[in-house]
C-alpha cells in the first residue's frame, strides 16, 4: 500500500518523444523516495479549471536525486495533459503520490520473465526492467505500438527487446502476442501494462499455461485514492469496501494478479 502525500514538484526537464507523447522529469521532496515500479502519481493543472488531477504512471524513479520521470500522452486540446505539455523547466506542479500498489519484484527473481507494454502502458515497464536487474531475472521486453515507437533505446539497455507495431513498420506486424509467437518466446512470470484487449489476451495466455501473471490495469480514475469508486473493475472476490465483486483500480491496484480480476 502506498504512503501517499501531496506536494509541489519542480519540473527539471520536458521533451516530446513522438507525436503526442511527452517525457517530464520532476524533482520532488518525498514522493520519489517512496515510489516503486508500477505506481502512479496524480498531477494537478495550475489554472484551477479542472478539479480532478490526471493519473500518470511512473516511468523512472531516481531516489538518489529525489526525481521522477513521467511519460504521458496528450489526449486532446484544452485537456489537462495538453496543459502539462506546455510547461517548462523550472515550473512548479502539484502532485499526489505515490499511489496504488506496484509490481512484486520478488516474483521474477532468477526467472525468465515477460515484460509486456502496450501504448501508454510502455513507460512503467522501463523502471520495472531496471529494478529487476537486481534479482537476476532473464528479461524479455515485448512492447506494442500502433505505429510510432518511443523509449526503445532505454528498453534495449535493460533487457532483450521485441517490438510489435500494428502497421508492421517496426518489428513484428500485429500485437505483442504475435511477437511472442513469431519469436517462440517462453516465460515463467509475466508483468504487463496496457489497454484492456491486450491484457485480456495476456491473461488468457497465462492462465492456459499456468504462468504467474501480474497485470496493471488502465481505467479512468477520478479521486485516485479509492473513495469515489469511479475506476472499479470486476473481481472474483467480494470487496470489503463496497461489498460487491469489484476492485478499485487506483487503490487495490493498479497491479493485480491475473487470476484476481475479470478484464
Positions of predicted regions on the chain:
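FNR/FR-type flavoprotein reductase catalytic core
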Residues: 79-220
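Structural signal for conserved beta-strand scaffold positions within catalytic alpha/beta enzyme cores
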Residues: 13, 60, 163-165, 215, ...
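Short, basic/aromatic-enriched C-terminal tail that caps enzymatic domains
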Residues: 5, 246-263
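Local cysteine-cluster metal-coordination motifs and their immediate loop/turn environment
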Residues: 124, 196, 219-254
Amino acid at each position: 500500500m502506498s504512503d501517499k502525500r501531496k506536494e509541489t514538484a519542480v519540473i527539471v526537464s520536458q521533451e516530446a518523444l513522438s507525436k503526442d507523447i511527452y517525457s517530464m522529469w520532476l524533482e520532488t521532496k518525498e514522493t520519489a523516495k517512496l515510489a516503486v515500479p508500477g505506481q502512479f502519481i496524480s498531477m494537478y493543472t495550475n489554472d484551477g479549471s479542472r478539479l480532478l488531477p490526471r493519473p500518470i504512471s511512473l516511468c523512472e524513479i531516481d531516489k538518489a536525486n529525489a526525481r521522477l520521470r513521467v511519460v504521458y500522452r496528450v489526449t486532446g486540446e484544452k485537456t489537462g495533459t495538453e496543459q502539462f505539455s506546455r510547461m517548462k523547466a523550472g515550473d512548479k506542479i502539484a502532485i499526489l503520490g505515490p499511489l496504488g500498489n506496484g509490481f512484486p519484484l520478488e516474483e521474477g527473481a532468477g526467472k525468465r520473465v515477460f515484460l509486456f507494454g502496450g501504448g501508454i502502458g510502455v513507460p512503467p515497464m522501463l523502471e520495472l526492467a531496471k529494478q529487476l536487474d537486481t534479482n537476476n531475472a532473464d528479461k524479455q521486453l515485448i512492447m506494442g505500438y500502433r505505429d510510432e515507437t518511443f523509449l526503445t533505446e532505454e528498453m534495449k539497455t535493460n533487457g532483450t527487446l521485441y517490438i510489435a507495431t500494428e502497421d508492421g513498420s517496426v518489428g513484428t506486424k500485429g500485437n505483442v502476442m504475435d511477437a511472442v509467437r513469431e519469436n517462440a518466446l517462453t516465460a515463467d512470470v509475466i508483468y504487463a501494462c496496457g489497454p484492456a484487449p491486450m491484457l485480456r489476451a495476456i491473461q488468457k495466455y497465462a492462465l492456459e499455461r499456468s504462468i504467474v501473471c501480474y497485470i496493471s490495469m488502465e481505467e479512468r480514475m477520478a479521486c485516485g485514492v479509492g473513495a469515489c469508486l469511479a475506476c472499479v473493475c470486476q473481481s472474483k472476490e467480494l470487496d470489503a469496501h463496497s461489498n460487491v465483486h469489484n476492485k478499485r483500480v487506483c487503490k487495490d491496484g493498479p497491479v493485480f494478479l491475473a487470476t484476481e480480476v475479470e478484464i
